[in-house]
């Protein structure tokens, strides 16, 4: 059991159970999965850029990244159906908890002028999406070896029914939201 998962079971579950008056600990919302996505529009012309993104996302997540391909052809973007346009990884269980721990305690504090995450990334159903401008904040990547910094989306899917439940869950786990 990872450190963050232990915090969830020992501290977060009782707090949420008391706050929302759940009768069973199984009703308490939890984290289902974490999805990481890098979208590279320029990768359709540059194959080296795509390979680099896959390698870096694999290093960050600890799991092999999968190439995402275009569903439709768009002539104005010089895009054909099936061309690679990005890569993604879905983390569950142990790797998910390890990644969230690393994100909250190491990566986010390394962001320049970091004052917390705005809480407007919730989708109305308790899931949270966070955009990162530079993926070099993760300790697995050496800033000197990264040719061009890439942005990425991180989506945390929870079993919460509302944004209030989801925010309290992530807040109790240690997600640094703006006050």
Swiss-Prot record:
It holds the Pfam family Ribosomal_L5_C. Keywords: Ribonucleoprotein, Ribosomal protein, RNA-binding, rRNA-binding, tRNA-binding. Signal peptide: none annotated. InterPro entries: Ribosomal_uL5, Ribosomal_uL5_bac-type, Ribosomal_uL5_C, Ribosomal_uL5_CS, Ribosomal_uL5_dom_sf, Ribosomal_uL5_N. GO terms for biological process: translation. This is one of the proteins that bind and probably mediate the attachment of the 5S RNA into the large ribosomal subunit, where it forms part of the central protuberance. In the 70S ribosome it contacts protein S13 of the 30S subunit (bridge B1b), connecting the 2 subunits; this bridge is implicated in subunit movement. Contacts the P site tRNA; the 5S rRNA and some of its associated proteins might help stabilize positioning of ribosome-bound tRNAs. PANTHER family: 60S RIBOSOMAL PROTEIN L11-RELATED (PTHR11994). HAMAP family: Ribosomal_uL5_B. This is Large ribosomal subunit protein uL5.
């Amino acid at each position: 059991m990872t450190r963050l998962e232990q915090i969830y079971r020992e501290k977060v579950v009782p707090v949420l159970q008391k706050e929302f008056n759940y009768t069973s600990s199984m009703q308490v919302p939890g984290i289902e999965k974490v999805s990481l996505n890098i979208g590279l529009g320029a990768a359709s012309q540059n194959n080296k850029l795509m390979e680099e993104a896959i390698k870096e996302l694999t290093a960050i997540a600890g799991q092999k990244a999968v190439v995402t391909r275009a569903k439709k052809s768009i002539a104005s973007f010089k895009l054909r159906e099936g061309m690679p346009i990005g890569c993604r990884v879905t983390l569950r269980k142990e790797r998910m908890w390890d990644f969230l721990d690393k994100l909250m305690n190491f990566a986010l504090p390394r962001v320049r002028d970091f004052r917390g995450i705005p809480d407007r990334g919730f989708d109305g159903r308790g899931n949270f999406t966070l955009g990162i401008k530079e993926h070099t904040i993760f300790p697995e990547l050496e800033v000197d070896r990264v040719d061009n910094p890439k942005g990425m989306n991180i989506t945390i899917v929870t079993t919460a029914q509302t944004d209030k439940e989801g925010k309290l869950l992530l807040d109790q786990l240690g997600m640094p939201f703006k006050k």
